[in-house]
Amino acid sequence: HPILIDKYLAGKEVEVDAICDENGVLIPGIMEHVERAGVHSGDSISVYPTQKIKPEIKQIIVDYTERLAKALHVIGLINIQFIVYEDQVYVIEVNPRSSRTIPYISKVTDIPVVDVATHVIMGKTIKEQGYEYGLAPEKETVAIKMPVFSFEKIKGAEISLGPEMKSTGEVLGISKDFDEAIYKAFMGTGINLPKKKNIICTIKDSAKEEFLPIAKQYYMFGYDLYATEGTYNFLKEHDIPVSKINRIADKTNTIFDLMLTDTVDLIIDIPTRNDNLKDGFVIRRFAVEAGIPIYTSLDTAQALINCLEKRHKGQTSLVDITK
């Protein structure tokens, strides 16, 4: 049987929905994912307009989109997913169809994508409908599309994120700045943003160095860190105050004991491969059933502490996206 092997690039994933006619392409907006490539696009936090993509990289994405649409003779909608890695743009996949991001990008750009594409298919060009080719001007507001999961209703389901889509819905956070927009999105998912200031950390070895500055941020913001042995030793070696908790098999001071005290706000669990056969899976399932927010991506954990640092004293604003 044939096997396809792709090289994995730990880059920034970017997504485009575009409308194509015989003369050109209209790109309502470019969407940037918070989680790096490897997490299914439907499970990633999506940001419009992009926050960390250079203007010259955006232009390359526009150019690739136009060239691909022309080469594939697409009339109507096209969805393209890219990876930006070390200032190089790579194409993950091209889908000559609509995608789940169409309602999102239509709402936040005020371009009725489905309506325009339908008229294109029926013979009316993009320009005849009053739009210009190329990338549409970006809006001043920032819009965050955040996935919602139903793991508590699916007994035994693995919650760590990967290439298989697991989310069952999404919410939208909108503001004039990124940090408030993502703060609203976190609240919209029903997550109790940390209040008790206790966080459990269990991080695989290959991610410990990357986790270090994130751990420092949580500690400096006033959180007490609890960690299993490997993560505990690593944080202690780098002079970050942390309390040790034992694995499930131990009889006292276990991770379960702490979770049962109802004092844990958040769990950051970066699993190893095949961790569903180990303690990690049991911990993640217990957290879901106990209603404790748990993140299995450092990018999400980083986004949360960033917005908490900048939003903890401010009032959230109201934004009318129809204006």
Give a label for each model feature.
Residues 1-195:
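ATP-dependent carboxylate activation and anion-phosphoryl transfer catalytic cores
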Residues 97, 205-206, 271-275:
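Short glycine-rich anion-binding loops that position phosphate/pyrophosphate groups of nucleotides
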Residues 188-199, 218, 257-264:
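Glycine-rich phosphate/diphosphate-binding loops that line cofactor/substrate pockets in enzymes
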Residues 214-220, 288:
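Surface-exposed amphipathic alpha-helices with a cationic face
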Residues 222-234:
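Short internal beta-strands
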Residues 246-247, 255-323:
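Peripheral docking tails and interdomain loops at the edges
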